Amino acid sequence: VIMINYLMGFLSNFFNPAVSFVAITDHKSVINKLSRIYRFAKIINSSVDKYSYIGINTWVVDTHIGAFCSIASEVYIGLATHTIDNLSTSPIFTERKNATGHSWVECDHAINRLQTEIGNDVWIGFRAMICGGVTIGNGAIIAAGAVVTKDVPPYAIVGGVPARIIRFRYSQDIICLLYTSPSPRDGATS
């Protein structure tokens, strides 16, 4: 079944000039034709809006990516979690098909897959990691190597492990103005 999903994703994006021939997408992912997905990127159960690009060998899982986003190479977005309220965190106890190749259950137990949201005009640096369920606000910048475990406000610049706010790109007055003015993201023209 997994192979069929990837094959369907490959075929659905075969004629999409936005997706590299050697990128991997599944049939649930929606890639805007005005975006770019570079080689060896893996896009699973996600959407990528117009004028955004995803760098080489980047993984995107269970994520919506807004317009005008710049995502560097080797970034991981929507990192999976393990159950932590069971006796063990091993997927042997929750999934029939898992990374170990072994299972002690006859049916899969529900695992809460968290949707990750990346706003518009977000820049994510090389080898950053974004945990599942995080929301990154419009205009935010994620520094290279950062590990984002919590929501990031609009126009914040974050970095570190775990990521923390370094500063904001603009004053709060300008950020408010940006939210009340029409922008190219909304289809406005000058």
Residue ranges and their predicted role:
Residues 15-21, 27, 36-134:
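Flexible, glycine/small-residue-enriched loop-and-beta-strand segment within the central core
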Residues 153-155:
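Conserved catalytic segment of ABC-fold P-loop ATPases
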Residues 179-188:
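Conserved small/polar residues in nucleotide/adenosyl-binding loops
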Residues 166-176:
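Solvent-exposed, charged amphipathic helical/linker segments at domain boundaries
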Residues 2-5, 9-13:
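Short hydrophobic helices that act as membrane-entry/anchoring signals
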Residues 133-135, 139-151:
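Basic (Lys/Arg-enriched) interaction patch that binds polyanionic ligands
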